[in-house]
């Protein structure tokens, strides 16, 4: 599979409690067929984070990869925006 044809998503890290694994919440919008209203859909993906760099609240980009475990099918590409800790 060519690297350019892999799925790439951008989302927010909602959990980093696992070792080398983050949970990313990806929100998308779909248009209702009948009424045309935009409806928000969200899905959680587990992604591989080798250096444990991503923290909760960060906006990250993940890319599809080979299965790394039972649930992990994505890997961390980059941290787009770091969370502001107050």
From Swiss-Prot:
GO MF entry, a single one: structural constituent of ribosome
Record's GO cellular component terms: cytosolic small ribosomal subunit
CDD domains according to UniProt: Ribosomal_uS17
Listed GO biological process terms: translation
Keywords in alphabetical order: Ribonucleoprotein, Ribosomal protein, RNA-binding, rRNA-binding
Top-level taxon of the source organism: Bacteria
One Pfam family recorded for the sequence: Ribosomal_S17
Family the UniProt entry places it in: Belongs to the universal ribosomal protein uS17 family.
Assembly and oligomerization: Part of the 30S ribosomal subunit.
Function: One of the primary rRNA binding proteins, it binds specifically to the 5'-end of 16S ribosomal RNA.
PANTHER family for this protein: 40S RIBOSOMAL PROTEIN S11 FAMILY MEMBER, SMALL RIBOSOMAL SUBUNIT PROTEIN US17M
Name this protein carries in UniProt: Small ribosomal subunit protein uS17
Lineage of the organism: Bacteria, Bacillati, Bacillota, Bacilli, Bacillales
